[in-house]
Design a protein with these regions (language model features):
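Short, well-ordered beta-strand core segments
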Residues: 69, 84-86, 131
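P-loop (Walker A) phosphate-binding loop of NTP-binding proteins
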Residues: 8, 20
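Hydrophobic anchor at the beta1->P-loop junction of P-loop NTPases
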Residues: 5
C-alpha cells in the first residue's frame, strides 16, 4: 500500500513518519526524492521553497508491490498513490511551531489560514476515496500513528474524517 502522508507544513508529518518507520513502513521523503530524481524545477523566493514538478515526479512512483510505503510531504497527495493520511493541527499550535522554526510572519499567516480552511484536506479528498484525517493537536506521535494505523485502508470505501473545524479562528 502506497500512502500519501500529507498536511500543512508544520503539522508533524516528519515526526509521524519516524514513528511509522519503527512500525515497518518504508518512508519516502518527497522533497528529497524530488531533488534526487531531478524534479525540482526552480525556487520560489517569495515562499522560500523549491518548486517541484509533481507531474514529472508522478511518473516515477513505483507500482504497488504490497509493501507499506509512506510518501511524506505536503505535496504527497498530488502523487498517484493508493490512499492518504492527512494530519490536521490547531492553527494556533501550527503558528507557534512555524514561528519557532523561524518562518517569516507572512508564511506563518499563510499556513495558519490554509490549515483553518482545510486546503490540503480538500485537495486530497479530490484524489483519494481512501483517506483518513486525524487531528494531531492533543495526541502524542505514537497515539497519532495508532489513530491512523487502526483504520484498515484496504477495506476503506469512503473517507474516514475525524471532525475538525477551525474556521472560527479566521
Amino acid at each position: 500500500m502506497r500512502v500519501a502522508l500529507t498536511g500543512t507544513p508544520g503539522v508533524g508529518k516528519t515526526t509521524l513518519s519516524a514513528v511509522a518507520a519503527r512500525h515497518g513502513w518504508r518512508i519516502v521523503d518527497v522533497k528529497a526524492w524530488a531533488a534526487k530524481e531531478g524534479c525540482v524545477v526552480g525556487r520560489d523566493e517569495a515562499d522560500e521553497a523549491d518548486v517541484i514538478d509533481t507531474k514529472r515526479l508522478s511518473r516515477k512512483v513505483a507500482p504497488d508491490d504490497g509493501s507499506k510505503i509512506l510518501y511524506e510531504g505536503h505535496l504527497s497527495h498530488e502523487l498517484p498513490l493508493d490512499a492518504a493520511w492527512v494530519i490536521r493541527l490547531d492553527p494556533e499550535e501550527l503558528a507557534r511551531r512555524l514561528a519557532s522554526r523561524g518562518y517569516p510572519t507572512a508564511k506563518v499567516r499563510e499556513n495558519f489560514e490554509a490549515e483553518a480552511i482545510d486546503i490540503i484536506l480538500q485537495e486530497a479528498l479530490a484524489r483519494f476515496p481512501r483517506l483518513v484525517q486525524r487531528d494531531g493537536t492533543r495526541r502524542s506521535p505514537e497515539a497519532l500513528y495508532k489513530a491512523f494505523a487502526d483504520v484498515g485502508l484496504e477495506s476503506l470505501k469512503a473517507p474516514d474524517l475525524e471532525p475538525v473545524d477551525w474556521t472560527d479562528r479566521l
